[in-house]
């Protein structure tokens, strides 16, 4: 059965996308279509936004104060294009490369539309993502931007924690969150058992939507939850990578969605990120990694491996070599995983060894070096991994170890997928000025 066949469908007339170019041109945005290129295909363009401030979005004073407190001055490309549309209540399907602040788009847009005095015991916003760590991070983003909205309550729900605590929280009007953040499995269980009621939901958001809708189990959970929500609501979906097939799946959940693609699909490059590869034998990886960590200047570094076993072993080896390392993978208990993620984010450790569980959406501002100790198996996974460095327009460095013919094939696929050439890392290294912000 295809993705489309088992999803809620709307009539063909309702699924007419409006595509907005990412060029900051309000008139073009109102026209709703990206200009076609010579081949007749509609594409967006990548243009930096420096003149517009968050105040121009006419956000609530409480949100503007929170934005100022966070130190943000100018919206990124994706924020500039998407926030004005999202706060009007339009359904939104947005693809934008890693590090451009997609989370802030739906956080600000939904908070802007909330009542000043939200009704106690009623959930009006639901945000789902595919990992517990990302759910935890999104919850924190809501708390950060809602700091001057004292009546707003945010709750996070995910598997691996006692469901009794969730039920207790939801059973009391005084503690029941207005904003529900979580993973599909736990949210669906709470909805199915009638502990969480979504009859008054106004906003339905999926972050890293392709990851959830591409996995049958998660997709089934998402659909079951969707059926428990009102027909009239705002639906927003975000990801750094959206294939044409997944776009079609996403739009099955939407009515007349506004499609926003910041940068066209062939240019999902990360501006400011220096990318290299190192060709070596498998047995040479540890020595080369040691050399890089000794010689590179970095704030924090994330190292990706292919399995939980390799993650544990490499973390142990690094600590034996006196490198301040921690490991994050699915084999670690939930509470310990959150604890390690928090410690890394708070700069208590400078090196994190991880599987792909850390490869999507997780935002640690100080990471400026990403190393693929093991190459990913797909080009899109590469984008999400190296996107951990050079977040939000800052500089960064990625180095990928290529040790087999399969690795070489993936490297070639990455270069073809993103129309980019990744050079070999110079034997004498590179200047830290090329990947370190002043």
UniProtKB/Swiss-Prot annotation:
Q: Which GO terms describe its biological process?
A: mRNA 3'-end processing; mRNA export from nucleus; mRNA splicing, via spliceosome; subtelomeric heterochromatin formation; transcription elongation by RNA polymerase II; transcription-coupled nucleotide-excision repair
One GO cellular component term, please give it: spliceosomal complex
Look up keyword ATP-binding and say if it applies.
yes
SUPFAM superfamilies xref list: P-loop containing nucleoside triphosphate hydrolases
Give the chief site where it resides.
nucleus
Q: Where is this motif: Q motif?
A: 52-80
Q: Which reaction does it catalyse?
A: ATP + H2O = ADP + phosphate + H(+)
One example of the protein's molecular function in GO is: mRNA binding
Task: Name the positions where ATP binds.
Answer: 96-103
Keywords, alphabetical = ATP-binding, Helicase, Hydrolase, mRNA processing, mRNA splicing, mRNA transport, Nucleotide-binding, Nucleus, RNA-binding, Spliceosome, Transport
- Helicase ATP-binding domain residues are 83-260
Where composition is biased (Low complexity), the residues are 21-38
What Pfam family does this protein match (any one)? DEAD
Task: Give its localization.
Answer: Nucleus
Q: Where is this motif: DEAD box?
A: 207-210
E.C. no: 3.6.4.13
User: Region Disordered: what ranges?
Assistant: 1-41
Annotated family:
Belongs to the DEAD box helicase family. DECD subfamily.
Q: What's this chain's function?
A: ATP-binding RNA helicase involved in transcription elongation and required for the export of mRNA out of the nucleus. SUB2 also plays a role in pre-mRNA splicing and spliceosome assembly. May be involved in rDNA and telomeric silencing, and maintenance of genome integrity.
Entry's free-text remark on domains: The Q motif is unique to and characteristic of the DEAD box family of RNA helicases and controls ATP binding and hydrolysis.
Q: What is this protein called?
A: ATP-dependent RNA helicase SUB2
**Phylogenetic classification of the source organism:** Eukaryota, Fungi, Dikarya, Ascomycota, Pezizomycotina
């Amino acid at each position: 059965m295809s993705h489309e066949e088992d999803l809620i469908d709307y009539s063909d007339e309702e699924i007419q996308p409006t595509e907005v170019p990412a060029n900051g041109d309000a008139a073009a945005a109102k026209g709703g279509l990206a200009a076609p290129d010579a081949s007749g295909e509609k594409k967006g363009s990548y243009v930096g936004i420096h003149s517009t401030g968050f105040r121009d979005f006419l956000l609530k004073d409480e949100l503007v104060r929170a934005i100022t407190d966070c130190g943000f001055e100018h919206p990124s490309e994706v924020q500039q294009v998407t926030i004005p549309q999202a706060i009007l209540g339009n359904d939104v399907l947005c693809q934008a490369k890693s590090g451009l602040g997609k989370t802030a788009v739906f956080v600000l847009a939904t908070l802007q539309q909330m009542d000043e005095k939200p009704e106690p015991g009623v959930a009006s916003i639901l945000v789902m993502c595919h990992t517990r760590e990302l759910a935890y991070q999104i919850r924190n983003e809501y708390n950060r931007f809602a700091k001057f909205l004292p009546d707003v309550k945010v709750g996070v729900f995910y598997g691996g924690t006692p469901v009794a605590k969730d039920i207790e929280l939801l059973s009391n009007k005084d503690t029941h969150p207005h904003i529900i953040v979580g993973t599909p499995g736990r949210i669906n269980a709470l909805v199915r058992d009638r502990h969480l009621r979504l009859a008054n939901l106004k906003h339905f958001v999926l972050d890293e939507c392709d990851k959830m809708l591409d996995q049958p189990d998660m997709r089934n959970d998402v659909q079951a939850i969707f059926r428990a929500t009102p027909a009239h609501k705002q639906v927003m979906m975000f990801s750094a990578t959206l294939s044409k097939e997944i776009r079609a799946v996403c739009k099955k959940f939407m009515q007349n969605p506004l499609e926003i693609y910041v940068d066209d699909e062939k240019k999902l490059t990360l501006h400011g990120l220096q990318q290299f590869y190192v060709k070596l034998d498998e047995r040479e990886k540890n020595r080369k990694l040691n050399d890089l960590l000794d010689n590179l200047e970095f704030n924090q570094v994330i190292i990706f491996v292919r399995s939980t076993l390799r993650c544990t072993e490499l973390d142990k080896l690094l600590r034996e070599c006196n490198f301040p390392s921690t490991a994050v993978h699915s084999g670690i208990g939930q509470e310990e995983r959150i604890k390690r993620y928090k410690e890394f984010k708070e700069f208590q450790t400078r090196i994190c060894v991880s599987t792909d569980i850390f490869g999507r959406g997780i935002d640690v501002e100080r990471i400026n070096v990403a190393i693929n100790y093991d190459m990913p198996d797909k080009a899109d996974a590469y984008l999400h991994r190296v996107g951990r460095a050079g977040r939000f327009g800052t500089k960064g460095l990625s180095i990928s170890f290529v040790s087999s013919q399969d690795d070489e094939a993936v490297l070639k696929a990455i270069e073809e997928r993103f129309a980019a050439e990744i050079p070999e890392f110079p034997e004498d290294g590179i200047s830290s000025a090329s990947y370190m912000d002043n």
